[in-house]
Amino acid sequence: FLDASYEIADKVEMIHPARFLFNAGSTPKAWNEKMLSDPNFKVLDYEADASKLFHDTDIKGGVVISYHDRTKTFGAIQVFTKYKELNAIRNKVWASSTESIMEIIYIQNRFNLTNLYRKHPECKSGIGSDGRDSRFEKNIFVKIPLFQEEKEDNSIRTLGIYNGKRTWRYIDSEYVDIDHENLKKYKVVIPAANGSGEFGQTLSTPVIEMPMEAYTRSFIGIGAFNTKEEATALLKYIKSKFLRAMLSVLKVTQMTNKDVWKYVPLQDFTAHSDIDWSKSVVEIDRQLYRKYDLTADEIEFIE
């Protein structure tokens, strides 16, 4: 609709959903990036709570009044944030950061379909894409009865959702792809749908998973560590206000998919880190503020 309006007028002012400004939502990523790179496009006003403008309406990610002028150059937005303070913090953090935590984020575990169908061909009807999708989907505990409540020898404990509740089930390791990136490692698992997208919102109930523990599409896994101590350090980082602020650069809906973690800097979670992970989360926040040379005003904004 926006593209069509730009074809028929030099100057276009619109009010519309804002999720694409954060490279989120259902619009194609290529289109999002095109809009954010358009020097003729700018934001006049942004409102995170759409119900303030459209009563009794919930528009995830808020709404924006945008202006496009083919005859003027405003400069590309590139990265849009709700707050000018957050954009300044992002610029400062990424002036010295080179790696994002998204590099250690992994999607759900997978079946070994060859082994599964050899012994249980009837399971093919419960697998997506006509039996070709090997991933542990959200409803897999219902679709595949091989996930059991009781643990048996060589079974893999799997975290998922059953009847709307977080649940652990067990499946024989023979039916699982054991080459998944973090199956044999320590990791932190969090719900894929988490909160509402409000700034700095606490991420609900992250848990540490041990080696040979898995998770369904209802969750994402962060890390692939050799030691539990590293996973514990990551868990503290996830609970920090600093991380939650950096996550808010792109997280404006409930989804915590890999892409929204782009501006969260990766840390060294070992004992050799420049952060002392043995400290409390409050003290870890202070260390992170010092590491990135944040001002008193920037710290107050995050806090």
Features from the language model and the residues they span:
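C-terminal substrate-recognition regions of SAM-dependent nucleic acid methyltransferases
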Residues: 50-216, 223-296
